[in-house]
Curated annotation (Swiss-Prot):
Enzyme Commission no: 3.1.1.4
Control of this protein's activity: Heparin and wedelolactone inhibit the myotoxic activity. The PLA2 inhibitor, para-bromophenacyl bromide (BPB), inhibits enzymatic and myotoxic activities.
Cross-referenced PROSITE patterns: PA2_ASP (PS00119), PA2_HIS (PS00118)
Top-level taxon: Eukaryota
Remaining remarks: Negative results: does not show neurotoxic activities.
Note on how the cofactor is bound: Binds 1 Ca(2+) ion.
Compartments where located: Secreted
Protein name in the entry: Basic phospholipase A2 Cvv-N6
UniProt organism field: Crotalus viridis viridis (Prairie rattlesnake)
Length: 138
């Protein structure tokens, strides 16, 4: 189900944060968010439950927690500014929400890069019903 919603959003041309996050992921990992991270493990993509399957999935769990901590923000649609210098993502000026959303996305993209060596193709398009372990708290 999670994959359906992500593909639907991509097809209608979502502007803003989701596309910015995809660009950050591409810059850091040389992989597109879809298909590599949009439905990986139990937490990458829409929603999440259970225990993260590996370090990459934990990046998504932490990213979800980061978004949860934002109050009165729209992390999936707010547009923020950032730049890319010598392999480093630098979040730019903006509202407090925009800065925090950018930092959440930057941290996740860096986490994905750091965990590329342990990325497992078997967790791509992982089915939600397989995420049966008790969920962790943020």
């Amino acid at each position: 189900m999670r994959t359906f919603w992500i593909v639907a959003l991509l097809l209608v041309g979502v502007e803003g944060n989701l596309l910015q996050f995809n660009k950050m992921i591409k810059m850091m990992t040389k992989k597109n968010a879809f298909p590599f991270y949009t439905s990986y493990g139990c937490y990458c993509g829409w929603g999440g439950r259970g225990r993260p399957k590996d370090a990459t999935d934990r990046c998504c769990f932490v990213h979800d927690c980061c978004y949860e901590k934002l109050t009165n923000c729209s992390p999936k649609t707010d547009i923020y500014s950032y730049s890319w210098k010598r392999g480093v993502i630098i979040c730019g000026k903006g509202t407090p929400c925009e800065k925090q959303i950018c930092e959440c996305d930057r941290a996740a993209a860096v986490c994905f890069r750091e965990n590329l060596p342990t990325y497992k193709k078997r967790y791509m398009f992982y089915l939600d019903f397989l995420c049966t372990d008790p969920s962790e708290k943020c």
